[in-house]
């Protein structure tokens, strides 16, 4: 998967970005069964071609400073996001093909939306970044990559742009503070903050923000949070924007049943579940669980469900790992203040009607 010619171009620099071609299907490259599977799939080969074409069109139309950020963003997508959610085994080639195809098409849609075209876009995006390489061994490399709305014509877009600028400013400040040559860094030290591909529909946008810090030891720290916004509001999304408070308990129970079935799960997710002096204390969601569950910075959207990501050590020790639950729209829509839910069939139908009305107005045929 990671041997695409486009990847080689990106890693080699931006000067030859227009030369990106389809997947390398030479005998040497197809020793990797994943590459071989793609090379046998006309559907994926065409999708790869379309991806390169969409990337080149976006890249070629942007100034050099935006090109530099796009290169890094696309490099990270190819290395870490292309195969997200897809099977890595040979036993499920059809499912893997469909998953990879959907991921590639989603990336193409993002490139289109970055130009301000397409049914689910909120306007043209511009790309910004800050990169400070190590100058000496004791330094820390700093990299920040974000995007902003080119025309922030709503309070939500203005707030989103301010958030992106704050990420850049923080990276620059850390670059100043951390690179003082104090000898605290003795290995491969780096800090990365990167906006990943957003989900957007109607007046809503959900943007993953990936953070990673390596301090030279065996492990690094980091994770993904989500900037979720209604674009007609200046504030980031709150639980109350989506669900009334009095529905918090039944909705949380749907999630808790996945994270701690029968009360068995991460140590901090559950209260009760024990007997004392002959009295039973049944398992219930803990205060820690409820607090984390109700924080939309852990919510990701895909148009079909809300996934709640708790992160490591939120509900238990490091060894207990990260936990998450998935709430399909059809299980929570009855509770939601948002109607239609972003990306749902009802929302897509609404956006199609709005787009049709706009086009009719532009052509002079609308009412």
Which role does the model predict for each range below?
Residues 18, 69-70, 292:
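Intrinsically disordered, low-complexity regions enriched in Ser/Pro/Gly/Gln/His and often acidic
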């Amino acid at each position: 998967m990671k041997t695409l010619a486009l990847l080689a171009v990106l890693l080699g620099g931006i000067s030859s970005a227009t030369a990106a071609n389809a997947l390398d299907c030479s005998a040497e490259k197809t020793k990797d069964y994943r590459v071989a599977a793609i090379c046998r799939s006309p559907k994926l080969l065409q999708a790869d071609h379309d991806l390169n074409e969409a990337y080149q069109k976006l890249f070629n139309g942007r100034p050099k400073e935006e090109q530099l950020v796009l290169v890094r963003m696309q490099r990270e997508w190819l290395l870490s996001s292309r195969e997200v959610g897809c099977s890595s085994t040979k036993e499920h080639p059809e499912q893997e093909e469909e998953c990879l195809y959907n991921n590639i098409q989603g990336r193409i849609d993002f490139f289109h939306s970055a130009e301000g075209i397409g049914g689910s876009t909120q306007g043209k995006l511009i790309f910004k970044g800050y990169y400070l390489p190590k100058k000496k061994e004791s330094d820390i490399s700093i990299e920040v990559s974000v995007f902003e709305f080119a025309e922030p014509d709503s309070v939500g877009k203005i707030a989103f742009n301010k958030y992106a600028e704050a990420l850049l400013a923080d990276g620059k400040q850390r670059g100043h503070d951390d690179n003082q040559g104090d000898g605290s860094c003795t290995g491969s030290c780096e800090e990365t903050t990167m906006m990943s591909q957003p989900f957007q529909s109607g007046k809503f946008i959900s943007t993953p923000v990936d953070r990673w810090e390596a301090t030279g030891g065996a492990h690094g720290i980091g994770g993904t949070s989500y900037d979720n916004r209604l674009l007609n509001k200046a504030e980031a999304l709150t639980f109350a924007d989506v669900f009334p408070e009095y529905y918090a308990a039944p909705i949380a129970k749907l999630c808790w049943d996945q994270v701690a079935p029968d009360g068995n799960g991460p140590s901090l997710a559950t209260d009760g579940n024990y007997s004392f002096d002959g009295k039973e204390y049944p398992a219930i969601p803990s205060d820690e669980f409820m607090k984390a569950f109700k924080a939309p910075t852990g919510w990701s959207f895909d148009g079909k469900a809300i996934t709640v990501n708790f992160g490591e050590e939120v509900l238990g020790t490091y060894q207990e790992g990260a936990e998450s639950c998935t709430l399909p729209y059809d299980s929570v829509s009855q509770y939601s203040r948002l109607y239609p839910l972003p990306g749902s069939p009802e929302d897509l139908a609404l956006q199609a009607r709005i787009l049709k009305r706009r086009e009719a107005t532009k052509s002079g045929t609308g009412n």
